[in-house]
Amino acid sequence: MLRIPANIRPVGFPSVAETLPKAVERIAQALKPEKIILFGSYAYGNPTPDSDVDLLVVMETNKPRKEHVVDVSLLLYPRLFPVDILVKTPEEIEEALKKRDFFIREIVTKGQVLYERPK
């Protein structure tokens, strides 16, 4: 299910509000992730003209993480705004939360789920 928050507004890159939903849909269709989570300034409602879009893609994979980051990155073209991509498996997320990883915990608790695969 695709959910784009209303607070994504044209700040610095007018195309984010228009382009992000299409990009998330392409990632969801091609890679079948468990979740796509928006985090950082766009998710927290305080983007600046220099802000990038931060995405965490949670998916099962046997490929090296760098390969999946490239796979996701290619699905974002044409890229009209800067994007930072993290790809993690559900197990990596679970392990990070057990270890009290602040960064992952913040993404999971404060981030906005843009897509969640139906169960």
Regions from the PLM with identified roles:
Residues 1-35, 44-49, 60-119:
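Catalytic core of pol beta-like nucleotidyltransferases
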Residues 41:
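Conserved H-loop
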Residues 51-53:
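Short, conserved active-site loops that position catalytic residues or coordinate cofactors/metal ions
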Residues 56-58:
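Short hydrophobic/aromatic beta-strand micro-patches
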